[in-house]
A protein has these predicted regions:
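Short, acidic Ser/Thr/Gly-rich low-complexity loop/linker segments typical of extracellular
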Residues: 136-151
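A short, solvent-exposed beta-strand micro-motif common in secreted/extracellular proteins
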Residues: 160-170
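Structured interaction patches on ligand/partner-binding surfaces of diverse proteins
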Residues: 2-4, 169-194
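Hydrophobic beta-strand segments
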Residues: 50-52, 130-135, 164
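Extracellular/lumenal mature domains of secreted and surface-exposed proteins
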Residues: 1-112
Length: 194
């Protein structure tokens, strides 16, 4: 008998993209609360859109590539967090036919910072009730007083640079600190010159 030739067409499925980029553990700088994600999402037919949900309830960062071959590799997404707390970052990559892949990073905990020190007389004895003023720019964010041992502690501060000064009637404390926070800063001590 005769043989018949049949043609067979093989179709391959179009797999969804793979969302990727900066290693999850390296996205957020815990000292500055600044997050930076460099995209490295891939797909055989191209990645048309990448979106980043920063986990803080704010706007989602999103970029769309409208030109073939559709690649957003190297695109930089950034966010500066405004408040302490736990954040879960989710990066979503979309291919040219709308298929999506989500990469969810483990929670990142943003903690506030503190500064501390003591106030002493010229003879090195502690001074109680010294007024310590902490400013960020021109705004006073905290005023505290030293305890009986001359010590003070200021907590719950966000990243930034703080101006720290000390005053008490009858004493002169010449030290002025312009202290970056993130991490915390102990040892901001004041010694009277009289």
């Amino acid at each position: 008998e005769g043989s018949k030739a049949k043609s067979i067409r093989v179709f391959t499925s179009d797999a969804p993209p793979v969302a990727g980029g900066t290693d999850c553990a390296s996205i957020v700088d815990l000292n500055t609360w600044v997050a930076t994600l460099v995209d490295n999402s891939l797909d055989v037919n191209g990645v048309k859109q990448v979106a980043v949900n920063w986990g803080d309830g704010g706007a989602i960062s999103s970029v769309i590539d409208t030109t073939a071959p559709y690649s957003l590799v190297g695109t930089v997404f950034t966010r500066t967090y405004l408040n302490a707390g736990s954040r879960v970052i989710k990066q979503t990559a979309y291919d040219t036919i709308g298929q999506a892949n989500v990469r969810t990073c483990p929670p990142v905990v943003l903690s506030t910072f503190g500064l501390s020190g003591n106030a002493r007389r010229l003879d090195n004895t502690p001074v109680a009730s010294v007024k310590v003023v902490v400013k960020k720019g021109a705004v006073t964010v905290r005023t505290v007083y030293t305890n009986a041992l001359g010590d003070y502690v200021v907590g719950n501060l966000k990243p930034g640079t703080y101006n720290v000064t000390a005053t008490k009637a009858g004493l002169i404390f010449p030290q002025v600190y312009n202290q970056p926070l993130g991490p915390s800063a102990p040892g901001l001590n004041f010694q009277a010159t009289n």
